Design a protein with these regions (language model features):
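DPxDG-like acidic metal-binding loop motif
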Residues: 63-121
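N-terminal subdomain of lithium-sensitive/metallo-dependent phosphomonoesterases centered on the IMPase/IPPase/PAP
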Residues: 1-73
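A structural micro-motif at secondary-structure boundaries
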Residues: 122-126
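An extended, acidic
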Residues: 127-182
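Short secondary-structure junctions
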Residues: 17-19, 120, 162-168
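Short glycine/threonine-rich catalytic loop with a Thr-x-Gly-x-Asp
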Residues: 32, 79-82, 167-168, 172
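Residue-level signal for inorganic ion chemistry
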Residues: 5, 9, 32, 43, ...
């Protein structure tokens, strides 16, 4: 599924001319919708009763306690701006327990997978977070600090001053890098 959804993303990458702003002013493209629909269709082929919650399309309630979460293009702003650090996120939850998830960054050729019974992998190689005992040695990654209200902004600034490095943007790619120990 991810190889093919990645092809949809790459076939649209740096070709986006139109986008729509959602109610929260975040952008969505036809590629977002096409990728999510493709992933949903593939899930429905095998699991027609599973619940699906997606970023762009209406939720499907399903009749089982199995839920798929889909963000077809995490980092749509990066995608629209021609930056390579966007990706597709998929998570599987059964009976309110996270079973696993995937971060797929097709333009970078990197895919992180993590399932409860296995180690986290990037491109099929085992990886792990860096152990940090002191906050001053930590790396902090966030989507954007501009989305915080004043109270959260103050907390963010305090935390930012307490860590070794802060990086913003890059959405899911940052989280993959953290999972790889960077």
């Amino acid at each position: 599924i991810l190889d093919l959804s990645g092809e949809i993303a790459l076939n649209n990458f740096r070709k986006i001319r139109d986008l729509t702003l959602k109610g929260d002013f975040s952008p969505v493209t036809k590629a977002d919708e096409d990728i999510e629909q493709f992933i949903r269709d593939k899930i429905f082929e095998k699991y027609p009763n599973h619940k699906i919650i997606g970023e762009e399309l209406d939720d499907f309630e399903g009749s089982e306690n199995i839920t798929w979460y889909i963000d077809p293009i995490d980092g749509t702003r990066s995608f629209v701006a021609g930056k390579h650090d966007f990706g597709t996120l998929i998570a599987l939850v059964i009976n309110d327990e996270l079973i696993g998830g995937v971060i797929d960054c097709p333009a970078l050729g990197e895919r992180w997978t993590s399932f409860s019974s296995n180690a986290t992998k990037v491109n099929q190689k085992i990886t792990k977070c860096k152990a940090v005992d002191d906050l001053k040695d930590a790396v902090m990654a966030t989507t954007s600090s501009h989305e915080f209200g004043m109270k959260k902004w103050r907390a963010y600034q305090s935390l930012e001053q307490s860590v070794k490095v802060t990086t913003t943007g890059s959405d899911c790619y940052n989280y993959g890098l953290l999972a790889s120990g960077y």
